[in-house]
Amino acid sequence: MAEETQHNKLAAAKKKLKEYWQKNSPRVPAGANRNRKTNGSIPQTATSGGCQPPGDSATGFHREGPTSSATLKDLESPCQERAVVLDSRSVEISQLKNTIKSLKQQKKQVEHQLEEEKKANNKKQKAKRVLEVQLQTLNIQKEELNTDLYHMKRSLRYFEEKSKDLAVRLQHSLQRKGELESVLSDVMATQKKKANQLSSPSKAGTEWKLEQSMREEALLKVQLTQLKESFQQVQLERDEYSEHLKGERARWQQRMRKMSQEICTLKKEKQQDMRRVEKLERSLSKLKNQMAEPLPPEPPAVPSEVELQHLRKELERVAGELQAQVKNNQRISLLNQRQEERIREQEERLRKQEERIQEQHKSLQQLAKPQSVFEEPNNENKSTLQLEQQVKELQEKLGEEHLEAASQQNQQLTAQLSLMALPGEGHGGEHLDSEGEEAPQPMPSVPEDPESREAMSSFMDHLEEKADLSELVKKQELRFIQYWQERCHQKIHHLLSEPGGRAKDAALGGGHHQAGAQGGDEGEAAGAAADGIAAYSNYNNGHRKFLAAAHNSADEPGPGAPAPQELGAADKHGDLCEVSLTSSAQGEAREDPLLDKPTAQPIVQDHQEHPGLGSNCCVPFFCWAWLPRRRR
């Protein structure tokens, strides 16, 4: 298939060359006309304007024998060379397309990995929130247990006081028993004495008194046994409550240990995620650097109409993608607009930086006025590098502030957990002894830590400030792009309006035609248009990379802006000139008197046929000036 397309292209190119030479060649005898139609070559001199020198015309009239075959061979050789150049150019274009497809696939893979990492981070944040809810429930349960413990302590105090009262009553009863026994012994002694003294009728009264005393003693023994049993029950209940409290303390300590272990695992996972994100960012930066490397410029060839149409379709598609990316960036910037009161300090810093950037722009404009057109990209490269350094510094500051806030939050959470995990054993017997003398006071409820709330609120404020700063960084990058567009417009207008040979050189720099200024203008314009389209595809890829880097500037350490590298590569080659297809340049070119020249008309006609090419942004065409090769 590729060979057939190449043969078709060669046949079409030969037909066009024959038609061109049939139109522009002067009327000569039949032998000379046949030679020119078969060869389809270009005149040798650039000043003749498509006409052969008189010597050659004379040889064409008088020499038709062996010299005609030599002229045919001489005219066929450049056609064969151009066919070979066309073949090599098509192969190179296919290779470039394959590289672009592979880079797009790599970009999609990296974006897919980033999305997976974001999903994992979201899951971890959800788990963190669940843990915070569990911590709150544990705090509530701890408060409830503290209230239960307070009530238990009060009941224990009540039972202890009751047991003390019973012990006092026992002591009094024992004392009374001893007294009664002593009294009984005295009574028995007195009764024996009286029995010895008195007669038998007095013995009945004494026996009755003895029975009463025995009954009282039995009642007292029953009361003593009851008091001992109640005292033992109180002691058993106290032991059971103490064991229950010890078990609850052990459970709480185990729970706090588990929570601390889970927090440690979460910290480790967070560190691993940060490392993965750093690795992905490094891989992205490497890919961007690889994509941003400028391709070595090669001499353009004369493209066919099919290639031109294909390139125009690609340009329209790339322009549509650029418009979609710009719209997406605008939507993201609109969604990320938040409160302005919290970023006053950051706005002041950014204002200072903007003032510096404006001063740099003014100095660049002042320096660019006396200099030539080809020395201006150096100053613009310096300004773009300074802007990139400022954006990188801002992003590094944002990353450092985010890490500091996260470390502070982790420290506060660990401090809270350590305070909650402290055992309450130091408030045991002393607390009971002190409260036994004083009136019982209600147990205060455990208040929530206000420092944790302040830390969470400050962390959320910091996240919002980070989002606002990322928006401001995007705005600065968009301003830089607009400034670059304006500079391109100025350069193009300067090139179009400049009198002399530069406009001609810019128009003539696209092809390998060796025709003069009058006879070969159409072929040269076609070559310049083909070179411009090839250069636009390279620039469009770089511009797309720059927009993607601006879109991902909030998540990555540094934006990959390939525009300065492309400019640096352009400065190294030296003899570059820019051609634009924007609407403003078109309007200025219509009023320009240079459009009367045939070299500038095909470019304007191409832009009128495809107006969508200049709708998005400035599209500079870096074209080589092949005048030295023509002169050779």
From Swiss-Prot:
Region (Disordered): 1-77, 352-384, 422-456, 505-524
Keywords, sorted A to Z: Coiled coil
Coiled-coil intervals: 86-154, 209-421
PANTHER family given in the database record: GOLGIN SUBFAMILY A MEMBER 8H-RELATED (PTHR10881:SF62), GOLGIN SUBFAMILY A MEMBER-RELATED (PTHR10881)
Biased composition (Polar residues): 38-50
Record-level GO BP terms: Golgi organization
Entry similarity comment: Belongs to the GOLGA8 family.
InterPro entries: GM130_C (IPR043937), GOLGA_cons_dom (IPR043976), Golgin_A (IPR024858)
Name this protein carries in UniProt: Golgin subfamily A member 8M
Native organism: Homo sapiens
Superkingdom of the organism of origin: Eukaryota
Entry-linked Pfam families: GM130_C (PF19046), GOLGA2L5 (PF15070)
Gene Ontology, cellular component aspect: cis-Golgi network; Golgi cis cisterna; Golgi cisterna membrane
Biased composition (Basic and acidic residues): 352-362
Composition skew (Gly residues), residue ranges: 508-520
